[in-house]
C-alpha cells in the first residue's frame, strides 16, 4: 500500500536514472513487488493453482539485467505476518476473495477482459510461490534473504547499516523508514527514477525545509499508512500543515480533539504503536545470523513488544532467512518442484520455434444471455452428436452427360453429348435408378452382350464422376416455381425403364445423324457472316427457327419407318406404368412438335438422351437471343403415338416461351382502363361532394369582408403633442 500520494508530491526531486550508473554497487530489491508485476501475465494460472513460470521469468530477466550492468542484487522477500498489519492483511484477503469470485463469474459469462482484471486483483503471492523463485536464485548464485516479517524494514536495515548502496522498490514506505537512496519504477530496460533523502528540503510541491526525519515519519503516519488508518478528511497536505504548525503528533492529536474532527479514543495509542513499529521492527542480521530490532530498543517500548514482531528462536529465524522454512508455519517446505529448473533452462536457452499449424484451436466462451444460453448449449450438444457423412460416389441424373457407344460413323454424337453436359443447369446427387434395373434383367441370356456393354459404360462413367471434386457437386441452386415442375418431369424421366435393344441405340444414332446433316446443310446456306444491325436480329432469329422446324419435320419423316420395331420392345415394358412426356431441350425443336416416346432414343443406363445441334461461331453471336424450345410428348400409349401425326400444344411453359411479352401492351391498356373506371367514381360533380369529404366553395355568395387596401388610415395628427405655451411662441415671432 505505502503512503498514498507521497511520490507524486516528491516529483520535483525525482531524477531519471539508468541502472548502469549503479555499476559496482550493491542494491536490495523488493522481490515481492517484482513478483506482483510478473503475476499480472499469469494471474489466472496462479489463482487456479495451474503450473506456470512467467512470474519467475519476469524476475530473473531483471536480475540478469542488473548483473549485466555490474550491479550486485540482494533479493529481499517478505516473511511472516506482522501483528500491526493484521487488520490490513485481513482486509486485503477479503478483497482478493471477492475479486476471485467475480473473476470466475466473468469467465463463465465469457467476459475475458473483466475476468483478467479481477484475476489481477485476486492473485496472492504466497510463500510457496516465493520459494520457487528462491530455488532458481540458488542455482544462479544470487544473494537473497527472507525477512522475518516485513521486507521494507529488512531493506531499511540493510541500507542503514551500509550493507547496500541503494534500494529498488515500488513501495513508498521506504521513505519514512529513513532510506537515503531509492530507485522507483524500474522497467525492463533498466530505466527508473531516483530518490535521495538529501534533496527533500528542495522539494517544491510540498515544502519540507526544516523537517526532521521524525517529523517526516509522523506526517506520513498521520496521513495514513499500513499500520494505521488515517482520520476522516486527513491527507498528506493537511497532515503536512498540522505538523508544520504544531511540530509533534501529540499536539496535533490534542488540537484535533478540540476541533470538529472526531478522533477515536484509542487513536493516540495506535499512533504510538505505529511509530514504534517503523523504528523498532524486528529484522534479520545476516552478519550475526540472528533476529534483532531495526533501531536500538527504547524504554518506552514496554513489556508487550510483540506488535513490532514476535520474538523467535535463532535457528528458526535463520531457517526462514535462508528460505528453508515457511515463514507462516515455520515448517520446512515440501519436496522441491522441477518448475524452477525448467525456468532457468528457458532463460539461458532460446525458445524452440513451433509452427503455427501445431497450435490447438482455441474455443472462446460466448457471453451468456437469454439467446446464447439456448443456442450455445444446443450447438455443443450438436457437436457431440455430429457424425461425419460417408463419402459415396455420385451418380447421374438425366440432365448430366449421357455416355454413348463409340462409333466411327457417328462422330457428332460425342460432340452433342458434350454440349448437353456443358449446358446442363443442374447436377444432383441422387442414386442411379438404372443400376437396379440392370440387376433385375440378368436372368435373360439374350441381353448379356448389351448388359456387359452397359456395365462397362456405367463403370467408366462412375470412375469419371468420383474423380470430380466435391465442390462441383455441392452447388446449391435456387429455383422458381417453374423449375419445380421441371424437376417433376425429370423425376418422371428417371422412372422410365431402360431399353436393352441394340436396334434402339442404332436408331437413335440414325436420327441424330439425319438431323445433323439436315441442320448442317441449312447452316451452310443461311448462316453467313453478314454484318447486320441489332434491329435486324429478331428477323434473323425467326428465320433460324423456321429452318429448324423444316429440319425437324424432315428428320421425323425419315424416322417414321423405323419406329415399328421399337413398338414391340416398348410393349415389353410394364403396361401399368404410364408413359410420361419427355422434354428434349434442343435448338431445332419447337413447342408445337410432339413426337412419340418410341421414336426417342433411350440410353440403357441413363434415361432419355438429349440431342442438340452444334453452334458455330456465327450462331454464338445470337445464342442469348434464341428462344429455347422443348419437344413435348403426349401422355398416351406409345403405339398410338407412332401412328398419330405431329400435334401442336397451345399451352406453353412460362420459362420456355417469352411470347407473352407481346401481350404486355394489351395488359397495360386493360389495367389503365380499369384504373380509369375505378377512379372515375371519385370524379367531382358540381352538386355533389368531393372525394376528400370537403364541401365545394360556394360561387354565388360574395365575400362581404372589406379588403385590406380599402381600410382608412388613422389620423396620426390627433395623437401629436401640443405644448401649452404655443400662443407665447407665436407672439414672440410676430414681434
UniProtKB/Swiss-Prot annotation:
Mg(2+) 1 binds at residues 30, 78, 150, 152. Its EC number is 3.1.-.-. GO terms for biological process: DNA repair. The keyword Transcription does not apply. InterPro entries: 5-3_exonuclease_C_sf (IPR036279), EXO1_H3TH (IPR037315), HhH2 (IPR008918), PIN-like_dom_sf (IPR029060), PIN-like_EXO1 (IPR044752), XPG-I_dom (IPR006086), XPG/Rad2 (IPR006084), XPG_CS (IPR019974). GO terms for cellular component: nucleus. Mg(2+) 2 binds at residues 171, 173, 226. Keywords: DNA damage, DNA excision, DNA repair, DNA-binding, Endonuclease, Excision nuclease, Exonuclease, Hydrolase, Magnesium, Metal-binding, Nuclease, Nucleus. CDD domains: H3TH_EXO1, PIN_EXO1. This is Exonuclease 1. It comes from Arabidopsis thaliana (Mouse-ear cress). The gene is EXO1.
Amino acid at each position: 500500500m505505502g503512503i498514498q500520494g507521497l511520490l507524486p508530491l516528491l516529483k520535483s526531486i525525482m531524477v531519471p536514472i539508468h541502472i548502469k550508473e549503479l555499476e559496482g554497487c550493491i542494491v536490495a530489491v523488493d522481490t515481492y513487488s517484482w513478483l506482483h508485476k510478473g503475476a499480472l501475465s499469469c494471474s489466472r494460472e496462479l489463482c487456479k493453482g495451474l503450473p506456470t513460470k512467467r512470474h519467475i521469468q519476469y524476475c530473473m530477466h531483471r536480475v540478469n539485467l542488473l548483473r549485466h550492468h555490474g550491479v550486485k542484487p540482494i533479493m529481499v522477500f517478505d516473511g511472516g505476518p506482522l501483528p500491526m498489519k493484521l487488520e490490513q492483511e485481513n482486509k486485503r484477503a477479503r478483497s482478493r476473495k471477492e475479486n476471485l469470485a467475480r473473476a470466475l463469474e466473468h469467465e463463465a459469462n465469457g467476459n475475458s477482459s473483466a475476468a483478467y482484471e479481477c484475476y489481477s486483483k485476486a492473485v496472492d503471492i504466497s510463500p510457496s510461490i516465493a520459494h520457487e523463485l528462491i530455488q532458481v536464485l540458488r542455482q544462479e548464485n544470487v544473494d537473497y534473504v527472507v525477512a522475518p516479517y516485513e521486507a521494507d524494514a529488512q531493506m531499511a536495515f540493510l541500507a542503514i547499516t551500509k550493507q547496500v548502496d541503494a534500494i529498488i522498490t515500488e513501495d513508498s514506505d521506504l521513505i519514512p523508514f529513513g532510506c537515503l537512496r531509492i530507485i522507483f519504477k524500474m522497467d525492463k530496460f533498466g530505466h527508473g527514477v531516483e530518490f535521495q533523502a538529501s534533496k527533500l528540503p528542495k522539494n517544491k510541491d510540498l515544502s519540507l525545509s526544516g523537517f526532521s526525519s521524525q517529523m517526516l515519519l509522523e506526517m506520513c503516519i498521520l496521513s495514513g499508512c499500513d499500520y494505521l488508518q488515517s482520520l476522516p478528511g486527513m491527507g498528506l497536505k493537511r497532515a503536512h500543515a498540522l505538523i508544520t504548525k504544531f511540530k509533534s503528533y501529540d499536539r496535533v492529536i490534542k488540537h484535533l480533539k478540540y476541533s470538529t474532527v472526531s478522533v477515536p479514543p484509542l487513536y493516540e495509542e495506535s499512533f504510538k504503536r505505529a511509530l514504534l513499529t517503523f523504528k523498532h521492527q524486528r529484522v534479520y542480521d545476516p552478519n550475526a545470523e540472528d533476529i534483532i530490532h531495526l533501531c536500538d530498543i527504547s524504554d518506552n517500548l514496554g513489556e508487550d513488544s510483540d506488535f513490532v514482531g514476535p520474538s523467535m528462536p535463532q535457528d528458526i529465524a535463520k531457517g526462514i532467512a535462508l528460505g528453508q522454512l515457511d515463514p507462516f508455519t515455520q515448517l520446512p517446505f515440501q519436496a522441491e518442484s522441477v518448475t524452477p529448473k525448467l525456468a532457468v533452462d528457458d532463460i539461458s536457452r532460446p525458445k524452440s520455434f513451433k509452427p503455427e499449424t501445431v497450435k490447438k484451436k482455441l474455443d472462446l466462451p460466448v457471453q451468456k444471455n437469454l439467446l446464447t444460453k439456448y443456442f450455445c448449449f444446443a450447438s455443443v450438444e450438436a457437436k457431440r452428436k455430429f457424425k461425419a457423412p460417408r463419402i459415396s460416389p455420385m451418380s447421374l441424373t438425366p440432365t448430366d452427360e449421357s455416355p454413348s457407344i463409340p462409333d466411327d460413323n457417328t462422330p457428332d454424337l460425342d460432340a452433342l453429348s458434350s454440349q448437353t453436359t456443358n449446358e446442363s443447369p443442374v447436377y444432383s446427387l441422387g442414386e442411379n435408378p438404372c443400376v437396379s434395373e440392370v440387376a433385375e434383367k440378368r436372368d435373360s441370356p439374350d441381353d448379356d452382350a448389351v448388359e456387359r456393354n452397359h456395365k462397362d459404360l456405367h463403370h467408366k462413367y462412375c470412375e469419371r464422376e468420383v474423380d470430380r471434386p466435391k465442390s462441383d457437386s455441392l452447388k446449391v441452386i435456387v429455383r422458381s416455381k417453374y423449375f419445380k415442375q421441371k424437376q417433376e418431369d425429370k423425376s418422371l424421366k428417371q422412372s422410365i425403364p431402360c431399353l436393352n435393344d441394340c436396334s434402339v441405340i442404332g436408331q437413335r444414332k440414325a436420327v441424330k445423324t439425319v438431323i445433323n446433316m439436315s441442320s448442317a446443310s441449312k447452316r451452310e446456306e443461311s448462316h453467313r457472316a453478314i454484318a447486320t444491325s441489332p434491329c435486324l436480329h429478331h428477323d434473323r432469329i425467326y428465320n433460324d427457327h423456321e429452318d429448324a422446324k423444316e429440319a425437324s419435320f424432315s428428320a421425323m419423316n425419315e424416322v417414321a419407318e423405323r419406329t415399328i420395331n421399337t413398338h414391340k420392345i416398348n410393349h415389353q415394358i410394364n403396361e401399368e406404368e404410364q408413359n410420361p412426356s419427355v422434354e428434349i431441350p434442343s435448338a431445332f425443336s419447337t413447342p408445337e412438335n410432339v413426337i412419340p416416346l418410341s421414336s426417342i432414343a433411350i440410353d440403357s443406363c441413363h434415361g432419355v438422351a438429349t440431342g442438340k445441334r452444334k453452334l458455330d461461331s456465327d450462331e454464338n453471336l445470337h445464342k442469348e437471343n434464341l428462344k429455347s424450345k422443348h419437344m413435348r410428348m403426349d401422355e398416351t400409349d406409345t403405339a398410338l403415338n407412332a401412328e398419330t401425326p405431329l400435334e401442336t400444344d397451345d399451352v406453353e411453359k412460362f420459362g420456355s416461351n417469352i411470347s407473352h411479352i407481346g401481350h404486355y401492351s394489351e395488359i397495360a391498356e386493360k389495367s389503365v382502363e380499369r384504373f380509369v373506371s375505378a377512379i372515375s367514381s371519385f370524379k367531382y360533380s358540381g352538386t355533389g361532394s368531393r372525394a376528400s369529404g370537403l364541401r365545394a366553395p360556394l360561387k354565388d355568395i360574395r365575400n362581404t369582408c372589406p379588403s385590406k387596401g380599402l381600410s382608412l388610415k388613422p389620423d396620426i395628427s390627433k395623437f401629436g403633442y401640443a405644448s401649452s405655451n404655443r400662443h407665447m411662441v407665436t407672439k414672440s415671432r410676430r414681434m
